[in-house]
A protein has these predicted regions:
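PLP-dependent class I/II
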Residues: 1-191
Length: 191
């Protein structure tokens, strides 16, 4: 869910050699981090990338405003101007009350974020622990966000107790939904 500073710096080093590549970061989970993870951005780690980096963020995750569809971007002026043109022709503005709430969320006290992250971390630890106890499932512990991305590779080619043959991650997800009532998204959906 997150790149360490060292991983991101290594990626920045590669990007510095390819000045035709633009960078777009999705920093929506900037504040939803765990285990002393240190958030960073390409433009911060490599100032030479600043002029070709667009940073996208919003209030959905850290401020529990999902569904409000409030976000913002920062980057080179010409790119932001182009975004404004596209946005003005493809969608209407966000409601004024949502905009006012977002301003208050961003400018108001931030002391609730740490307790929320503690709660998310406890849930993450429980889910990852339980997944890693399941036969055929392996799950790394993410350092940010509130999702996990377990591998079900150990279940492929096997037959479930009800006789269902599990050949793909989609088969596994369908089995979980139909037999256990658990809805998950297969990895194939993410490319």
């Amino acid at each position: 869910a997150a790149y360490s500073r060292a991983e991101l710096k290594a990626l920045c080093d590669v990007l510095m050699r390819h000045d035709h590549v633009w960078i777009m970061t999705d920093d929506m989970y900037e504040h939803v981090i765990y285990d002393d993870f240190e958030f960073s951005t390409p433009a911060e780690l490599e100032p030479g990338l600043h002029d070709r980096t667009i940073t996208l963020n919003g209030v959905s995750k850290a401020y529990s405003m999902t569904g409000w569809r409030l976000g913002y971007g920062a980057g080179p002026v010409e790119l932001i101007k182009a975004m404004v043109v596209v946005q003005s022709q493809s969608s209407t503005h966000t409601s004024s009350i949502s905009q006012a709430a977002a301003v208050e969320a961003l400018n108001g006290p931030q002391d609730f974020i740490a307790p929320h992250n503690d709660m998310f971390r406890e849930r993450r630890d429980l889910v990852v622990s339980m997944l890693n106890q399941a036969d055929g499932i392996k799950c790394l512990k993410p350092e940010g966000a509130f999702y996990v991305y377990p591998s079900c590779a150990g279940t492929l080619g096997k037959t479930a107790p009800d006789g269902t043959k599990i050949e793909t991650d989609s088969d596994f997800c369908t089995y979980l939904l139909e037999s256990e009532g658990v809805a998950v998204v297969p990895g194939v959906a993410f490319g």
